[in-house]
C-alpha cells in the first residue's frame, strides 16, 4: 500500500525474510541491548505471524515496523516473547510486541 505525502511516498507492506537484517538493525537502534529482540526472535516471529508484521519504507529504506501475534490469551505475558506457541489466528486478541521507528 503506497501512502502519498507532499514529499516522498511511503510504502506500507508485510515484512518478509528479506527484511530480517534491516528489522534487527532498527530494533537495535531503538531499544537497549537487554530489551531488543535479536535476529532469531524476528525469524520465528516472521514464520509465526508474518501477516501481522508490518514495515514502513521510504525511498526503499525501512524506517518503521510493528509486529505481534493474534492469540487466545487476553493478557500479554513475558513468555509470549520467547515462544511461538501463543500464536493463534483464531484468537480474539491482537498483541503488539514492538513498534520501532528510525530515530
Predicted features by range, described:
Residues 1-5:
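Short acidic N-proximal helix/loop "leader" segments that mark the beginning
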Residues 15, 99-101:
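Hydrophobic adenine-recognition pocket in adenosine-nucleotide-binding enzymes
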Residues 24, 28-49, 75-80:
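Conserved GNAT-fold acetyl-CoA-binding loop/helix
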Residues 14, 44-47, 55:
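Short secondary-structure boundary/capping segments within folded domains
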Residues 52-69, 102:
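Conserved beta-hairpin
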Residues 66-99:
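Conserved acyl-donor/pantetheine-binding loop and adjacent beta-alpha core of acyl/acetyltransferases
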Residues 6-9, 62, 90:
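A short, polar/charged loop/turn motif at coil->beta-strand junctions and beta-hairpin connectors
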Residues 10-23:
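A short beta-loop-alpha structural element at the N-terminal edge
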Amino acid at each position: 500500500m503506497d501512502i502519498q505525502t507532499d514529499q516522498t511516498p511511503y510504502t506500507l507492506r508485510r515484512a518478509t525474510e528479506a527484511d530480517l537484517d534491516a528489522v534487527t538493525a532498527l530494533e537495535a537502534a531503538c531499544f537497549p541491548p537487554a530489551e531488543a529482540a535479536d535476529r532469531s526472535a524476528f525469524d520465528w516471529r516472521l514464520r509465526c505471524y508474518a501477516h501481522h508484521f508490518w514495515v514502513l519504507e521510504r525511498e526503499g529504506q525501512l524506517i518503521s515496523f510493528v509486529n505481534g501475534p493474534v492469540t487466545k490469551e487476553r493478557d500479554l505475558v513475558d513468555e509470549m516473547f520467547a515462544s511461538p506457541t501463543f500464536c493463534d489466528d483464531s484468537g480474539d486478541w491482537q498483541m503488539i510486541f514492538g513498534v520501532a521507528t528510525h530515530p
